[in-house]
C-alpha cells in the first residue's frame, strides 16, 4: 500500500456497491465497521502476529520459512480497514431461503465482500483479506454484539501496481487449477457427459486462451 489516502467519495462508492449485493431473502445481513484508528489497528495487528505464529507451527521447514516470509497483511499500512460482519437477527428470525440452509446468511455476506472487492479494483484501490486473526479479539475491540459474526477483515488502500496473478500463485505456493479440473457434469467427479459436449470441449481448451 502507498501512503495516499482513500477519498471519502471513492470509499462511499465502494461501500454502495457492497451494499447492493444479492442476499438470501433480501435480508442484507451485513454491516461494515470502518476502522482507521491506529490504536485499534495495532491491537488487531498483534492478533495477526499471534495467530500467524500459531499457524507456522503447523508446517515444517522449508515450507515454514517460506510461509513466514510472505506479506500476509497490511493492517497498519492501509489507510482504511473494514470489518464485514453477519447479523442473523436482521428482519427477525424468519428469512425466506434461510430456513433449510442457515449458512445462506453468511454466504450473502460473502457476496457483499465480492462486490466490495470488485468495486475497489475498479476505483484503483488494492484490497487484502486478512483471515489470520482471532474473531474473539475482533469482537472485543470492535464491541460487536454477541450474535454478530465477523466474516472478513479487509485492508484497503492505493497500491503502486496490481500484479497479474495472485501472490501465492506467483511465488509458486500453490498452482492455479485448470477449469476442467473443477467442473463435473450431472454427478460428483463425472468428467464427461454427452449432454455437455460443447462446453466440455470449450473448457478443455482453457478459458484463458479463448478470445
Question: Which residues does each predicted region cover?
Answer:
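Generic N-terminal amphipathic, Lys/Arg-enriched alpha-helix
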Residues: 1-4
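A glycine-rich helix N-cap at a beta->alpha junction
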Residues: 52-60, 144-168
